[in-house]
Every structure is written in structure tokens, then in C-alpha cells.
């Protein structure tokens, strides 16, 4: 079976390689002819391509060779940079709607210009997605020279922009922006009251840089727009004190699944403590419905204390908990954990506890980016997640060869008995490299570890730079100069991705760049090359091989020399939490005889442990998206209804009246008879009119139909000037409120649904069933509330409504 799969895969690869080779040859064959064009003639090619697209029905595939040749020439004329053949191949893969895996330093920023230009010709907009504002600004400023030379408009969206600026930026042919800004703009647009207030166009085509970081690493973190709910801060403060007192034998901490659960003895002890503190009534059970909020707060407090580390998972800054991205080491300002976990952390750190937030709108990156008509991406490390990209996003990964052979030497891992011995070995290597002026990049997994290692380097009198979440503002500059002779740089995980570490330092960051500076740079580059290039040191294996490969990939760019090595200890999280007992016991025996173990077997064993973790994380993400897809389908319906209302030139309430009346009559029917008292009460509560005449009439259905239509007609005559706008405002406002409540229900449902597995029920099927029923109730309530609000509305002044 596996042989068959490999044959199919190899066959597919051969076909792609053939197509890439053919495409490249076509682009190269046009280079001389395009080079002979004047600047005006080159710019006019854009108009010519559009005419072929719109008037001659040509396809983008047919235009690709000439368009790519034009971009290559424009880049050479404006930036002095000619796209290499491998970059042309990468650009072709992007146009095909695939992921282009290219080694670090291969010029992915330049690759994106090819597919961005070609797809912008369709005049539907192209989004080039980066991981932070700095890269979005940098790439816009850098690449806009190419686009403008070809007559296209380019823009950039950053977090400090207002709506009018955003709307203008989205109208450009090509827009650079972060994944967060794009996602939040989509959510905010779908909370607006008119089309004119919305900023985004339809989602046509996206090129995602560092696609693995955005579509894999951040897939489990939804974008959430929230509002404040009732204050329960006192509960978190109380539960934190209680959790701190609780003996660790009364609960089980599972670091693999990041959960905490009370033992039976723990449940009994908690019940007694809560009764003593008068949080629950004497004789009451911990898991009775009225006590579930207490249980939830306590569980979150136990998680905050046992599973979340200060300076690793978060930092405290200006009296706030600021989350740290576990994959990049960057601070995530404005992000808060949901479900009370953030409040539990605030209680743990004795900070002011903020109110819990209620979700007003949310979406995962998985579902946001799947809305694009075409999606593609670039990264240096996608192959290990090939299956996930294919299964969830329908994206194929194509590995592009490097322009020059990779000369980096990847040494076997070294493993030590303790963290102390590991750091001593790292210091010894750092001194050795520093003496011969070989630059070093040391990757750590947390702020705490980076600062601890920094203290050790200071003791050894080794000058160095530290890049972690606390130095975020200097990220690009620190990383850019990490290739200078003798430089030592400590960086958390993959901070600084997107900025090249050039041997000798990056001259573009030298403000006083001149002939003298260029000579100095050339001299420094030669010194570093002779010393062996950049030496990357990993202080710990990450859960994902991909993150380790990203760190290694900082060295050996574009055929440069370089080295890499990982130093590990038995204290490391990967070995402690995920390593098998067999590996750990074998290592302990070996380490008792030697100072360190260095063998390819160790590297292979650790990679097996990493594969296990990757597989588990993939299953979690795959399972999460199954649940999120249910919510996403409902979100699409709600957002579509909002758009239809905003675009409507006329809204007829009579079909809604008919539906509401039919449902009200059905609810008041008992066997073949109406409960008239119930019916009168229901109709009066909806229509705000007297319906006592129902006692006297025989044609109940006819009377209700006639009277309700008369009420609506009278209200429409009273508000004729602003009638359409009143209807739109009412319908959208009520829909938003009900959707907000529905999201809260779904959040609670998802938290509790796993209990269904205990009763031998499939949690996903149960979730779908209950979510569907709740969505039907939302629709019924929406229609009823529309009518109830419309008949009660009074105009106080122009554009101001008051529901009586």
C-alpha cells in the first residue's frame, strides 16, 4: 500500500516538475525581448494583459510567462535584483494555489511579487499576508517600486489605521497586511450597519508568507471581538486562594493534554472547603447545576497555577497579563485567554481582575483563509505538515530547490544530565566560536531561559544581544546584525523570522551606509566565512520538528557556510513530558558514565518523540475544525443575512408576519383546539395591541391574519420617510444580539459536550444536533423580535429610534 502511495506521490511530483520546467523555460525565453522594452512600453504591458483577460478571454495561465518576465525586468530596473530561476518556479507554484517551500534566504519576498502581479490583473485585489506590522510595512516599501513601475497600486494595512484609510488600502491592486488585521477587519465588517461602512472587498486571492506559522501554529487560537459580561472577579480571587492551599495529591496535572482534574478525595476536600466558606450550601454536591461556575473557576485557577509559567507563557507588564506566542516568543498585546483562564492568571499574579468577556464575533484562521477564492503560501518548513495542509486547506506542498547548494553542517545533538551541565557546554562552545569571530545565534524556548542564559554569558564576560518578547521593538535590527564577526545573539524560538541574517551583518540596517561602510561589510563577511559562517545553537528541542528546522534554517542561507547543533538535558520539557521511559532510562545509564551523549541514535529517538507530539497536535486541530465548521456554517448564514439586509432596496415584513403568526398559532393549539387565553397573551406580547376579540370570532386564523397585516401597514405609513432604514436597523440589531447569545451558548455547549462521550454518545454528532436546534430557535426568535420591535418603534429625531 505504502509503495503505491509513494508511486502516486512520485508520479505527481514528476508531473509538477515537468510543468515547472516548461513554465520556467517559457519565462526565460522572453527575457531578451522584454529587456528591450522602454519603461513606458513595459508599463503599458499591464494594460495589454488586462485587455487580453477581459476582451479576448485569455486566462491568467496563458499570460503568466510574459507577465513573470515583465516582473523580473521591473525588479532588475528598480531594485537591481533579478529573479533567479528557482524564484520564478516558486512564483509559478504560488499562482497554482499551492505552498512553495523554499530555503531561508532564497528571497521569498521577491517571489511573492510574481504571483501578486499576475493575479492583480483580474482587478479583484490580492492580499499578501505577513506575521507582523513591521514586515508588512517593510515589504510594501521595498516591493512597491516593482508594482508601480508596472502601473499597479500597492498599499499596506497596519494596526494603527482608521476605517477610511483601511477601505482605501483594500481598494489597491495589491495589499500587504498581517493575518490578524485581515481577520479582524472581516469580523468588524460583519458588525457594521451599512455596506458603505465596510472596508474589505471580496476575498479573492491570498499569498501567505510564513504559511506554517499562520495556518498551523495559530490555527487553534481564534480571533475574537468581545464585550464585557457580568463581573465574577471575586470568584477568581477566592478560587485562586483555595487552589493555592490545595494539596497537590488531590488533583492530577496532565502536561501532555494541559488539563487538571480533581481526584475523588479532591472533590470531597473541595466540597468541605466551599461549604466552610459558604460558597455552597451544606449537603450540596459540587457538581449540582448551581455550583458549576464555581467548579469552572476552580479548575481554571488550578490550570493557571500548575500549567502556565510566568516569563514562558506570559509576562506581567504595566499591571497586565501579556500572552507570549509559544511559537515565535512574541508578545500578543490585546489577546486574552477565554473561558476565565485570563482572570485566573490575573488572580494568580495578584493583579486587578478584569471582567470576563462575552464573544460578539469570532473566527479561526482556518476558516477565515478557507474563504479566499484562491490561497497559496510560502515557508522554509512545510514538508513535515504536508498532510495537514492538504487535508484542512486543500494545499499541496511543492519543495523548490535552493539557488545554491546548502553548505550548513548539522551536528548531532548533545545531551546532558542537567540544565546546568548543558549551559556549561553551550558557554564553552560560545567562547570557542567568539574567539575565532564566528557569529552565534542561540535559540531558546522561553523568555525565562533566554534571560538565564544571558546571565551566564555576562558572568563569562561575553558581550551579546537578547531578543525576546521584551525587546520586540528592536527585533529586526538585532536579528539583522546577528551575522557580524563574533556576534552572540540569544533569541526566543523564531523571533525575527522574515529578516535575513547576512554574514558580516546586514548593510541595509546601517544608517551611514557608504563606500567605506560597504568595504567594512565585505571585510566582515570574509572574516565570518573563514570562521565557518553563522553557528546556530538550539538549547532545547521544540515539540515540533518544524520549529527546530526553522531555527537551523537561519544559518547556511543562499549557499553560505554555517553550522548547527542542539544541546539537550533530561530536564527539557520534550524528554520529561513526551519521551518514553525506555529512552529516559537508557539516557540516565549512559549519562552516569559519561559527561554527555552525542550520537545520531539520540537525534532519531527525539525525532520519534516529536512525531508523536506533532501527530497528537494535528489530531487536536483536526478535531477542533470539525466543531468549528459547524459554527462556521452558521456564521456564513448570519453574515449572509446581514449583507442581504444591507443591500436590500425594499424589505417586506409580511412573509415574516405570516411565519410568526403560524408559529404562534401552532404553539397555542392543543389537539384540534386553540387555547384562546394563551393565544391572546402571545399575540399581545408580540404586536402590542389588544387581541381580546379572539374570544368572539370563529375564524381565528383569518382574524389574526387581517389584524396583524393592518397593524404593520399602519406602522409603515407612520414611518414612511425612513421606513427602509428603520427596518434594516431593527433586523440587524436584533440579529447581532441573538447571534452574540448563540455564540455564548455554543461556547458553553462545546465545553460540556465531551461529557457525552461518557454516555457512549459521539460528541461531534451531539454538538451538531444541539447547535442546529439552537440555530432554529435563533431564527424563530429573530422573526418574532423583528415584528415586536417594529410595532413599538418611535422616531425621536432623524436617525434616532426608540423602542417603546
Swiss-Prot record:
Enzyme class per UniProt: translocase
InterPro entries, per the entry: Helicase_ATP-bd (IPR014001), Helicase_C-like (IPR001650), P-loop_NTPase (IPR027417), SecA (IPR000185), SecA_CS (IPR020937), SecA_DEAD (IPR011115), SecA_motor_DEAD (IPR014018), SecA_preprotein_X-link_dom (IPR011130)
CDD domains cross-referenced by the UniProt entry: DEXDc_SecA, SF2_C_secA
Alphabetic keyword roster: ATP-binding, Cell inner membrane, Cell membrane, Cytoplasm, Membrane, Nucleotide-binding, Protein transport, Translocase, Translocation, Transport
EC number: 7.4.2.8
Top-level taxon of the source organism: Bacteria
SS bond list: none
Any single GO BP term: protein transport by the Sec complex
Subcellular location: Cell inner membrane; Cytoplasm
Subunit structure comment from the entry: Monomer and homodimer. Part of the essential Sec protein translocation apparatus which comprises SecA, SecYEG and auxiliary proteins SecDF-YajC and YidC.
Family: Belongs to the SecA family.
Function: Part of the Sec protein translocase complex. Interacts with the SecYEG preprotein conducting channel. Has a central role in coupling the hydrolysis of ATP to the transfer of proteins into and across the cell membrane, serving both as a receptor for the preprotein-SecB complex and as an ATP-driven molecular motor driving the stepwise translocation of polypeptide chains across the membrane.
Protein name, entry field: Protein translocase subunit SecA
Species per Swiss-Prot/TrEMBL record: Neorickettsia sennetsu (strain ATCC VR-367 / Miyayama)
Amino acid at each position: 500500500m505504502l509503495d503505491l502511495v509513494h508511486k502516486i506521490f512520485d508520479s505527481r511530483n514528476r508531473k509538477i516538475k515537468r510543468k515547472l520546467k516548461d513554465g520556467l523555460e517559457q519565462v526565460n525565453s522572453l527575457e531578451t525581448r522584454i529587456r528591450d522594452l522602454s519603461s513606458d512600453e513595459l508599463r503599458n504591458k499591464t494594460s495589454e494583459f488586462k485587455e487580453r483577460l477581459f476582451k479576448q478571454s485569455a486566462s491568467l495561465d496563458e499570460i503568466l510567462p510574459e507577465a513573470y518576465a515583465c516582473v523580473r525586468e521591473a525588479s532588475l530596473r528598480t531594485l537591481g535584483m533579478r529573479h533567479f530561476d528557482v524564484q520564478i518556479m516558486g512564483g509559478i507554484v504560488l499562482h497554482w494555489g499551492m505552498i512553495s517551500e523554499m530555503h531561508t534566504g532564497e528571497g521569498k519576498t521577491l517571489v511573492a511579487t510574481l504571483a501578486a502581479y499576475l493575479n492583480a490583473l483580474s482587478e479583484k485585489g490580492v492580499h499578501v499576508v505577513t506575521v507582523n506590522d513591521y514586515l508588512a510595512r517593510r515589504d510594501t516599501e521595498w516591493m512597491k517600486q516593482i508594482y508601480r513601475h508596472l502601473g499597479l497600486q500597492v498599499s499596506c494595512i497596519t494596526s494603527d489605521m482608521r476605517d477610511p484609510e483601511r477601505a482605501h488600502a483594500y481598494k489597491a491592486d495589491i495589499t500587504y497586511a498581517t493575518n490578524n488585521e485581515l481577520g479582524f477587519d472581516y469580523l468588524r465588517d460583519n458588525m457594521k450597519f451599512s455596506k458603505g461602512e465596510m472596508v474589505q472587498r471580496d476575498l479573492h486571492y491570498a499569498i501567505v508568507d510564513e504559511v506554517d506559522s499562520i495556518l498551523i501554529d495559530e490555527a487553534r487560537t481564534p480571533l475574537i471581538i468581545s464585550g464585557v459580561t457580568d463581573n465574577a472577579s471575586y470568584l477568581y480571587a477566592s478560587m485562586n486562594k483555595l487552589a493555592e492551599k490545595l494539596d497537590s495529591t488531590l488533583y492530577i496535572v496532565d502536561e501532555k493534554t494541559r488539563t487538571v482534574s480533581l481526584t475523588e478525595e479532591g472533590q470531597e476536600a473541595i466540597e468541605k472547603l466551599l461549604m466552610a466558606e459558604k460558597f455552597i450550601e451544606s449537603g450540596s454536591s459540587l457538581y449540582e447545576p448551581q455550583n458549576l461556575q464555581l467548579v469552572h473557576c476552580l479548575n481554571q485557577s488550578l490550570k493557571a497555577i500548575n500549567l502556565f509559567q510566568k516569563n514562558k507563557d506570559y509576562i506581567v507588564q504595566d499591571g497586565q497579563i501579556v500572552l507570549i506566542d509559544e511559537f515565535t516568543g512574541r508578545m500578543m498585546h490585546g489577546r486574552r485567554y477565554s473561558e476565565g483562564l485570563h482572570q485566573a492568571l490575573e488572580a494568580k499574579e495578584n493583579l486587578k481582575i478584569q471582567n470576563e468577556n462575552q464573544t460578539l464575533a469570532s473566527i479561526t484562521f482556518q476558516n477565515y483563509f478557507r474563504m479566499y477564492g484562491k490561497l497559496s503560501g510560502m515557508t522554509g518548513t512545510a514538508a513535515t505538515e504536508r498532510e495537514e495542509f492538504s487535508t484542512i486547506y486543500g494545499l499541496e506542498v511543492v519543495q523548490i530547490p535552493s539557488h545554491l547548494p546548502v553548505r550548513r553542517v548539522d551536528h548531532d545533538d548533545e545531551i546532558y544530565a542537567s540544565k546546568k551541565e548543558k549551559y556549561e557546554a553551550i558557554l564553552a562552545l560560545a567562547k570557542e566560536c567568539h574567539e575565532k569571530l564566528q557569529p552565534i545565534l542561540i535559540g531558546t524556548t522561553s523568555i525565562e531561559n533566554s534571560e538565564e542564559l544571558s546571565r551566564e554569558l555576562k558572568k563569562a564576560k561575553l558581550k551579546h544581544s537578547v531578543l525576546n518578547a521584551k525587546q520586540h521593538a528592536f527585533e529586526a535590527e538585532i536579528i539583522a546584525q546577528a551575522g557580524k564577526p563574533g556576534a552572540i545573539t540569544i533569541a526566543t524560538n523564531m523571533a525575527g523570522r522574515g529578516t535575513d541574517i547576512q554574514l558580516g551583518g546586514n548593510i541595509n540596517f546601517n544608517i551611514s551606509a557608504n563606500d567605506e561602510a560597504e568595504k567594512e561589510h565585505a571585510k566582515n563577511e570574509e572574516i565570518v566565512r573563514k570562521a565557518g559562517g553563522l553557528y546556530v545553537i538550539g538549547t532545547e528541542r521544540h515539540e515540533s520538528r518544524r520549529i527546530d528546522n526553522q531555527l537551523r534554517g537561519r544559518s547556511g542561507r543562499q549557499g553560505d557556510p554555517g553550522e548547527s547543533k542542539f544541546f539537550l538535558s533530561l530536564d527539557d520539557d520534550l524528554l520529561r513530558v513526551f519521551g518514553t521511559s525506555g529512552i529516559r532510562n537508557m539516557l540516565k545509564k549512559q549519562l552516569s558514565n559519561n559527561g554527555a551523549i552525542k550520537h545520531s541514535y539520540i537525534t532519531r529517538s527525539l525525532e520519534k518523540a516529536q512525531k508523536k507530539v506533532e501527530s497528537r497536535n494535528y489530531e487536536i486541530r483536526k478535531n477542533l475544525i470539525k466543531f468549528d465548521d459547524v459554527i462556521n456554517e452558521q456564521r456564513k448564514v448570519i453574515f449572509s443575512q446581514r449583507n442581504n439586509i444591507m443591500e436590500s432596496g425594499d424589505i417586506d415584513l409580511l412573509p415574516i408576519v405570516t411565519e410568526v403568526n403560524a408559529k404562534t398559532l401552532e404553539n397555542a393549539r392543543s389537539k384540534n383546539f386553540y387555547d384562546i387565553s394563551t393565544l391572546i397573551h402571545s399575540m399581545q406580547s408580540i404586536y402590542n395591541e389588544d387581541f381580546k376579540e379572539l374570544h368572539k370570532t370563529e375564524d381565528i386564523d383569518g382574524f389574526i391574519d387581517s389584524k396583524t397585516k393592518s397593524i404593520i401597514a399602519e406602522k409603515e405609513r407612520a414611518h414612511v420617510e425612513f421606513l427602509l432604514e428603520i427596518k434594516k436597523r431593527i433586523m440587524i440589531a436584533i440579529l447581532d444580539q441573538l447571534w452574540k447569545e448563540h455564540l455564548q451558548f455554543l461556547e458553553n455547549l462545546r465545553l460540556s459536550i465531551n461529557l457525552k462521550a461518557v454516555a457512549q454518545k459521539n460528541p461531534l454528532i451531539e454538538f451538531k444536533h444541539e447547535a442546529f436546534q439552537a440555530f432554529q430557535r435563533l431564527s424563530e426568535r429573530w422573526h418574532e423580535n423583528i415584528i415586536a420591535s417594529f410595532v413599538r418603534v418611535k422616531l425621536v429625531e432623524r436617525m434616532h429610534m426608540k423602542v417603546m
